[in-house]
Swiss-Prot record:
This is Phosphoribosyl-ATP pyrophosphatase. It catalyses: 1-(5-phospho-beta-D-ribosyl)-ATP + H2O = 1-(5-phospho-beta-D-ribosyl)-5'-AMP + diphosphate + H(+). GO terms for biological process: L-histidine biosynthetic process. It is an enzyme of class 3 (hydrolase). Keywords: Amino-acid biosynthesis, ATP-binding, Cytoplasm, Histidine biosynthesis, Hydrolase, Nucleotide-binding. It is found in: Cytoplasm. Pathway: Amino-acid biosynthesis; L-histidine biosynthesis; L-histidine from 5-phospho-alpha-D-ribose 1-diphosphate: step 2/9.
Length: 107
């Protein structure tokens, strides 16, 4: 079972970093650079996750997915969204076939 509270603690830290000096905080520097910089990090971590998977490197898959989740959480926070928003969407989709879920999307 996933420890959802660790995600909430990370989210709280990310919120605090919005107020931090960009020269003293990596996350604050990402926020200061804006959406493009954050998206670039998410894309970079997604690519690294794919490379680890293609290499069948289990340890690196976990490391890279952790980095991907982290930077995805930075992106969520940047837009005023939270882990709870994502969890709510997972709950909404639970038990729905992927094909049916995609058909239900408006765009």
């Amino acid at each position: 079972m996933i420890d959802i509270e660790v995600l909430h603690r990370v989210a709280a830290t990310l919120a605090e970093r919005k107020k931090a000096d960009p020269d003293s905080s990596y996350v604050s520097s990402l926020y200061a650079k804006g959406t493009d910089a954050i998206c670039k990090k998410v894309a970079e971590e997604a690519a690294e996750t794919i490379m680890a998977a293609k290499d069948k490197d289990m340890l690196h898959i976990v490391w890279e997915v952790t980095d991907l989740w982290f930077h995805s959480m930075v992106l969520l926070s940047h837009f005023g969204l939270s882990v709870d928003d994502v969890l709510a969407e997972f709950r909404r989709r639970e038990g729905v076939s992927g094909i049916d879920e995609k058909k239900s999307r408006k765009n």
